[in-house]
Amino acid sequence: MRYRKGAPLTSDTSFSRLMGDILIAFVALIGRPLSRLLYSIRIETKKPEKSRKLPSRAILISNHCMPLDPVFHGMAVFPRRTYFTLLEETCEAPVLGSLVRFLGGIPLPRSGTRLDDIEEAVSHGLANRGLVHFYPEGECFIGNQKIFPFKAGAFYFAIKSGVPVVPVVTILRRRNGRKSTRIQVTVRVLAPIVPPPCGKNAHATLVRSILFSNQVHDLMQAEIECSGGDNSLYRGPMPRIRGVND
């Protein structure tokens, strides 16, 4: 089940679905109590009353500031399941690669020659689970509350697929005052944002994707700031671990 370079980006067999169901149940069983114990996690929804449920199809967008973000964000949409994108190197790891693939991981090849394959994988994810999750900063910046610029790929796929973007914001605060080292995590699901239509050609669509990414970025940053996100917690990019994120 481990991904190998050049292989299909999604795997949807009876065995992989069964293993995915087992792993999701296990993560749900231990993830919530563990997250509450370690981070006093709160999961909130900031939407109009008429749209409390997630859209049937959507691109999820998150800032990436904690190694456990995939667990937190999976809890935020549970019982819905989502495909999620991650580094190609992570999916190639012998054990971890198989686990994340069972859970719905879509590797993002560094080669620009596989852009069509990525678009096909996103379409597959939207057709089968309805949700595909992106971290458009490109990597994890531990403790960061000043979101780095977004890459436009996720927003391009939202425009091409005609599906809304749902921002899922991670807000970090110190639990007991500014001298505390303990972190309180709030995951807030914002209202869906309808993308602009496709442009007249690929270049025009890309330009719209960049503008759309900036719009969503600024909205998420404003949410962090008005909620008291504490950027003094920032510790820099997640260290490179060979076979995991390097």
Language model features: what each stretch is:
Residues L34-S40, L60-S62, L108-T113, G143-Q145:
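Short, flexible loop segments at the rims of nucleotide/cofactor-binding pockets, characterized by
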Residues M1-I59, L68-F72, G97, F102, ...:
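Membrane-anchoring hydrophobic helices of lipid-metabolizing enzymes
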Residues G31, H73-G74, G97, V122, ...:
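Short amphipathic alpha-helical segments and helix-helix/interface helices
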Residues R52-G112:
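Catalytic core of membrane glycerolipid acyltransferases/transacylases, capturing the structured
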Residues R2-S11, F15, I118-D246:
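Non-catalytic C-terminal accessory region of glycerolipid acyltransferases
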Residues P48, E89, G112, E137, ...:
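Proline- and acidic/polar-enriched loop/turn elements at helix boundaries
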Residues L37, R80, F102-L103, N128-R129, ...:
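Structured helix-beta-strand junction loops
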Residues G20-D21, T85-L86, S111, E119, ...:
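A generic secondary-structure micro-motif detector
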